[in-house]
Curated annotation (Swiss-Prot):
This is Toxin To9. Alpha toxins bind voltage-independently at site-3 of sodium channels (Nav) and inhibit the inactivation of the activated channels, thereby blocking neuronal transmission. GO terms for biological process: defense response. InterPro entries: LCN-type_CS_alpha_beta_dom, Scorpion_toxin-like, Scorpion_toxin-like_sf, Scorpion_toxinL, Scorpion_toxinL/defensin. SMART domains: Knot1. Belongs to the long (4 C-C) scorpion toxin superfamily. Sodium channel inhibitor family. Alpha subfamily. Keywords: Amidation, Disulfide bond, Ion channel impairing toxin, Neurotoxin, Secreted, Signal, Toxin, Voltage-gated sodium channel impairing toxin. Has the structural arrangement of an alpha-helix connected to antiparallel beta-sheets by disulfide bonds (CS-alpha/beta). The keyword Signal applies.
Length: 85
């Protein structure tokens, strides 16, 4: 089997698949969602954002999501800037 056939088959198998990522979902201003140790709140919030699941990460007391769509915004390295888009 030559390489071009192998590449074509691999491309067809991955076409239309959406990758997923994990992270802290954010609202305006790159601000994550505080959770106060409420896992149910975070799980609901994450699922509303099309994630597989979520929980309240006790170290930062912020919601953390598993399986967010690749297009979903997650917390970067910058500071929270409330009121900024």
């Amino acid at each position: 089997m030559n390489y071009s056939t192998l590449i074509a088959v691999a491309s067809l198998l991955t076409a239309g698949t959406e990758s997923k990522k994990d992270g802290y979902p954010v609202k305006e201003g790159d601000c994550a969602f505080p959770c106060g140790y409420d896992n149910e709140y975070c799980d609901k919030l994450c699922k509303e954002r099309k994630a597989d699941s979520g929980y309240c990460y006790w170290g930062n007391i912020l919601c953390y999501c598993y399986g967010l769509p690749d297009k979903a915004a997650i917390k970067g390295y910058g500071r929270c800037r409330p009121g900024k888009k």
